[in-house]
Amino acid sequence: MIKSGFITIIGRPNVGKSTLLNSIMGEKLSIVSCKPQTTRNSIQTILTRDDFQLIFVDTPGIHKPKHKLGNYMVKVAESSVKDVDLILFLITPDVEVGKGDRYILEQLKKENIPVFLVVNKIDENPQEKVAQTLKNYSEIFDFAEIIPISALKQKNVKELVELMVKYMPEGPKYYPDDMITDKQEKFVVSEIIREKALRLLSKEVPHGIAVDILSMKKNSKGLYNIEATILCEKESHKGIIIGKKGAMLKKISTYAREDIEKFLDSKVYLEVWVKVKKEWRDSDRLLKELGYK
C-alpha cells in the first residue's frame, strides 16, 4: 500500500489553478491563458512516485453561467468537490474575500474534507498584503493548512506536494506509473491548440472558440498527421483567427505544434482550419461531439 488519493483545485477564475497543476506535474496538461474560465473539462492528472499517487481534478472557475457550456462548466466545478480526499482552495492576495468565496467556503464546511488555503502569486504582492489575506481567510474558515506559493516560479510547490501526500489515505495505485492523464491524446492536443489561440487572439474572440480534432494518425515513420478545426461563432471572428494573409492562424499552428510534439514526444504535421458554427456553446449536439458533455 502507498499514500494515494484524489485532490480537487477550486477557486475564482484566473487565480492560477491550471498554472499550479502544470507546475506540480511538470507537464502542460491543463490549458493556461490570461482569460478567465479557460478550463472546461474536469481534467484528471496523475502524479506518481514510488511511495504515493496523487490524482488531481482541475475544474473550471465557478461563475454565473451565461449559456449551456457555462452551465456545464459550473456543474463540473461543483461536482468535483464530492468524493475527494483533499481540497485546495486557491486564492490570490490582491482580491478581497467576496460573497462568492464565503458561499463556497460555507458549502465546504458541510463536506468533512480537509481544505488547504493556497495563496498564489505571492511574488507579485507585498508581504503585508499576503499576511493580511491569510488573516482574513483564516478568520472565516478552519483550514487544515495554509500555504503561500508562486505557481509560476514554483516557489513552495514542492512543499505543497509533500503536505498533500501527508493528508492522503493509504491506498492502491489507481493508475499505471507512466500514466499522467486519463484524457485521450486527442483531447490534450485540442486543448493545446485552444490555449495557443486564446493566448494569441485579442479580446474580440473571447471564449467562443473550440477545437475539433478531425483526424490524428501516426505513420510508419512515427510522424503524427493531425487535422484540426477551430470553431468560432461569428464570421468576423473567423477573419481575426486567420489574420492578414493567414499570419495569425500560422502562428497559432506553429506554437501549438511545438507543444504537441513535446507532449507526444514525436514529430507532428499539423493542419488547422477555421469554421463558423453559430451559437455552438448552446448546441447540445456540438457540446457532446467536442467532449464537453
Curated annotation (Swiss-Prot):
NCBIfam families recorded: era (TIGR00436), PRK00089.1 (NF000908), small_GTP (TIGR00231)
Keyword Transferase part of the UniProt annotation: no
Region entry G1, spans: 11-18
Era-type G domain: residues covered: 3-170
Function of the protein: An essential GTPase that binds both GDP and GTP, with rapid nucleotide exchange. Plays a role in 16S rRNA processing and 30S ribosomal subunit biogenesis and possibly also in cell cycle regulation and energy metabolism.
Record-given protein name: GTPase Era
Classification via Pfam families: KH_2, MMR_HSR1
InterPro entries: G_ERA_dom (IPR030388), GTP-bd (IPR006073), GTPase_Era-like (IPR005662), KH_dom-like_a/b (IPR015946), KH_dom_type_2 (IPR004044), KH_sf_prok-type (IPR009019), P-loop_NTPase (IPR027417), Small_GTP-bd (IPR005225)
Family: Belongs to the TRAFAC class TrmE-Era-EngA-EngB-Septin-like GTPase superfamily. Era GTPase family.
Residue ranges of the region described as G5: 149-151
Record gene name: era
Keyword Endoplasmic reticulum included in the entry's annotation: no
Main location: cytoplasm
GO biological process: ribosomal small subunit assembly
Region (G2): 37-41
Residue stretches making up the KH type-2 domain: 201-278
Organism domain of life: Bacteria
Molecular function GO labels: GTP binding; GTPase activity; ribosomal small subunit binding; small ribosomal subunit rRNA binding
Location within or outside the cell: Cytoplasm; Cell membrane
Chain positions recorded as GTP binding sites: 11-18, 58-62, 120-123
Membrane topology: Peripheral membrane protein
Record's keyword terms, sorted: Cell membrane, Cytoplasm, GTP-binding, Membrane, Nucleotide-binding, Ribosome biogenesis, RNA-binding, rRNA-binding
Positions of region (G3): 58-61
Lineage: Bacteria, Bacillati, Bacillota, Clostridia, Eubacteriales
Quaternary structure note: Monomer.
Any one cellular-component term (Gene Ontology): cytosol
Annotated region described as G4, given as residue ranges: 120-123
